[in-house]
Amino acid sequence: MRITGGWSIVRQRLRTALRRPAAPTSSATNGRVPVRSPEELLAQPERLARLQAIEALTRVTPAHFEVLYRSALANYASYVQQLPASEAHHHAGLGGLLDHGLEAAVFALKLRRGHLLPPGAPTELIDAQADLWSYACFTAVLLHDIGKPAVDQVVTLFDKRGGALGPWDPWSGPMQAQTYEVRFVHNRNYQMHQHAAPLLARLIVPPEGFRWLASEREVLGAWLAVISGMPEDVGPLGQIVEEADRLSTAADLTGGIARQTPATRVRPLYERLVTGLRYLIDRGALQLNRPD
């Protein structure tokens, strides 16, 4: 694969975005959030630091990083914009889903270093496929919550004059609007977003990435099982993604005062506790007392 440009182009784009006199990416007026370019969204210092950490944790060349990793991150940022990752749990503020994805990607690539993949394979095969398995970890964790905007949230789009354009169709591609509002679906299924990921994967993973993942059947099979939310086939790849998700969630919940999106009303403590308990029960992380 011969590619020109590389990370220097990305740095230049990010420097340009930082010099623009645009409003901060977290700004929102009357509950409406501006649609931003991926360069603007990723130029925030903390996000830029995570981009650099992701690059440092990979072994690919800068040119390959641009095509395989950077393009996926730009697609992810363009798609999730500043949507929250949850209503009243982790990363519930503006940009929560983007921040969670980037942070979980860093954790996943760090955790991946502690695994020899595929398990039990000869050393030569492990070394030959090392970069591919790392990419599988990266893309799988980036996709683990990508279904939330499609099944857990309803996003309304507005034009530059403030006129309503109707609901966003998340199955078709990124938002095409000036601003947007988000609300959460009530009585939602907390597992459904996991099963939606394969339908949205091509909006995030570049064609070159898909071809690479499909080049090894064992890698592709494990990757598809993980992004489809199939716990019985989780394997080491799924364990890495789950642990990275937990670490990012824990870091946010213990990192200070939680934020919420403008459209989400401030909830009393008891209601947030009930929401959190319901979330844990629905995910199977907390079991109720059962008769013998």
Kindly give the residue locations of the regions a language model identified.
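Histidine-centered, transition-metal-coordinating active-site segments
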Residues: R2-A72, R112, L116, P198-D292
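Acidic/His-rich, divalent-metal-binding segments that scaffold phosphate/diphosphate chemistry
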Residues: T29-T179
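Divalent metal-dependent catalytic cores for phosphoryl transfer on phosphate-bearing substrates
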Residues: A85, L116-P268
